[in-house]
């Protein structure tokens, strides 16, 4: 097959029999088309007849492959994407989860759509990530990245915290609330949406600041240019049990008086879709919007 891809990496949902079956089928399908296939190590433990030299760490997969195929739900895609965004690698997903905003391909009969993608007939989007840093006494203590959102919150349910928010060092607001969601357009259909945040289409260079149960009736979500730097300064009156969650996967500890800096990361995720992909069609299907009236 004449393809822009040569080496394809497979990443799967751990301990999921249906995902494992799809991966096995996918592996056989790609080998039959003549591609070099490598498999993420944890994923490979679920499959049979995978040569040991084709089992690699996720970072090595990002370095060696031209295309990564993630089999699972959006959570699996997020975990892989935070690592793969560091590399010049295209990523596509086969949905073995629930909603599947980021995983386009249907596990039943994915072959036809995937073969079109492999022949070069696809739509590519570049999704930016957030870089999250925690500073204590002006010293960087921890950092990570997020594809969907960074969430400042207490580690207790229904526990109020106090903080100030700055945009490019301009004071914006102080708040007593359960926390704050800082979302990318990719994450605007995830936790942010559940918190009352706006849907941001993927091409927008914007981030949304969504308060979580604020102790005021005037607090509303705020959308700002993604090239701005968001800084959250924690009040000294807070308890010690605070944290910043990145995509609900990585947790950074935060203490009273710390500052959390959130900004657009330099690297972007190369997310690809079948040629007939429509973002609005995905919204309509996943969110059960009404069909056309005429």
From Swiss-Prot:
It catalyses: NAD(+) + ATP = ADP + NADP(+) + H(+). NAD(+) binds at residues 74-75, 148-149, 159, 176, 178, 189-194. It is an enzyme of class 2 (transferase). SUPFAM superfamilies: NAD kinase/diacylglycerol kinase-like. Its EC number is 2.7.1.23. One of its GO terms (cellular component) is cytoplasm. One of its GO terms (biological process) is NADP biosynthetic process. The keyword Hydrolase does not apply. Its cofactor is a divalent metal cation. Its main location: cytoplasm. InterPro entries: ATP-NAD_kinase_N, ATP-NAD_kinase_PpnK-typ_C, NAD/diacylglycerol_kinase_sf, NADK. The active site is at residue 74. GO terms for molecular function: ATP binding; metal ion binding; NAD binding; NAD+ kinase activity. The keyword Transcription does not apply. It holds the Pfam family NAD_kinase. Involved in the regulation of the intracellular balance of NAD and NADP, and is a key enzyme in the biosynthesis of NADP. Catalyzes specifically the phosphorylation on 2'-hydroxyl of the adenosine moiety of NAD to yield NADP. PANTHER family: NAD KINASE. This is NAD kinase. It comes from Pseudoalteromonas translucida (strain TAC 125).
């Amino acid at each position: 097959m004449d393809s822009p891809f040569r080496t394809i990496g497979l990443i799967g949902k751990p301990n999921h029999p249906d995902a494992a079956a799809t991966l096995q089928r996918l592996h056989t399908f790609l080998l039959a088309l003549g591609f070099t296939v490598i498999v993420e190590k944890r994923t490979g433990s679920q499959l049979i007849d995978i040569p040991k030299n084709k089992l690699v760490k996720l970072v090595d997969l990002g370095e060696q492959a031209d295309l990564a195929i993630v089999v699972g739900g959006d959570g699996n895609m997020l975990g892989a994407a935070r690592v793969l965004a560091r590399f010049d690698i295209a990523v596509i997903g086969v949905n073995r989860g629930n909603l599947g905003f980021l995983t386009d391909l249907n596990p039943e009969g994915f072959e036809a759509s995937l073969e079109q993608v492999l022949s070069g007939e696809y739509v590519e989007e570049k999704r930016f990530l957030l870089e999250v840093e925690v500073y204590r006494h002006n010293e960087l203590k921890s950092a990570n990245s997020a594809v969907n959102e960074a969430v400042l919150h207490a580690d207790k349910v229904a526990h109020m915290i106090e903080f100030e928010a700055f945009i490019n060092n301009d004071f914006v607001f102080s708040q007593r609330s359960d926390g704050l969601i800082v979302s990318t357009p990719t994450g605007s259909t995830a936790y942010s949406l559940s918190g009352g945040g706006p849907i941001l289409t993927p091409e927008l260079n914007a981030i949304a600041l969504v308060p979580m149960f604020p102790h005021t009736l005037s607090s509303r979500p705020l959308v700002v240019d993604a090239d701005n730097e968001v800084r959250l300064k924690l009040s000294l009156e807070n308890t010690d049990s605070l944290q910043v969650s990145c995509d609900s996967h990585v947790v950074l500890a935060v203490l009273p008086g710390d500052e959390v800096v959130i900004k657009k990361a330099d690297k972007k995720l190369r997310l690809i879709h079948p040629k007939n992909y429509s973002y609005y069609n995905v919204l309509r299907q996943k969110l059960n919007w009404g069909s056309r009236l005429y």
